[in-house]
């Protein structure tokens, strides 16, 4: 199961690199940025497709997009001098909260440690 989470992590990293390369290519006009973008976005979708074999689609997609948006926004501010308004910050905080809710909502309930009552054993009751 752990390998599928690794696939998801690689999908997120590839998406971030691909999207930042797209911005770099549009600013610089260099062909290299477009080539990196094509390979990274393609790789991102391939890794995401592998991840959703065992990771719930809603969780995988929320993490893939959400973490990607968060990190891309930070690097866009640092590298491309994009603005970060209080409204954008509030949106990112809401996004992180939403990701946490989606992820925590998919946990499997823990099995009780008590013996199974339907195992054929009969107990006297008072």
UniProtKB/Swiss-Prot annotation:
Family annotation (InterPro entries): Small_drug/metabolite_transptr, Small_multidrug_res, Spermidine_export_MdtJ
Assembly mode: Forms a complex with MdtI.
Name of the protein described by the UniProt record: Spermidine export protein MdtJ
rRNA-binding found in the keyword field: no
Pfam families: Multi_Drug_Res
Keywords: Cell inner membrane, Cell membrane, Membrane, Transmembrane, Transmembrane helix, Transport
SUPFAM superfamilies, A to Z: Multidrug resistance efflux transporter EmrE
Stretches the record annotates as Disordered: 104-126
GO cellular component, one term: plasma membrane
Taxonomic source organism: Yersinia enterocolitica serotype O:8 / biotype 1B (strain NCTC 13174 / 8081)
NCBIfam families given in the database record: PRK10452.1
Topology of this chain in the membrane: Multi-pass membrane protein
An individual GO BP term: glycine betaine transport
Function: Catalyzes the excretion of spermidine.
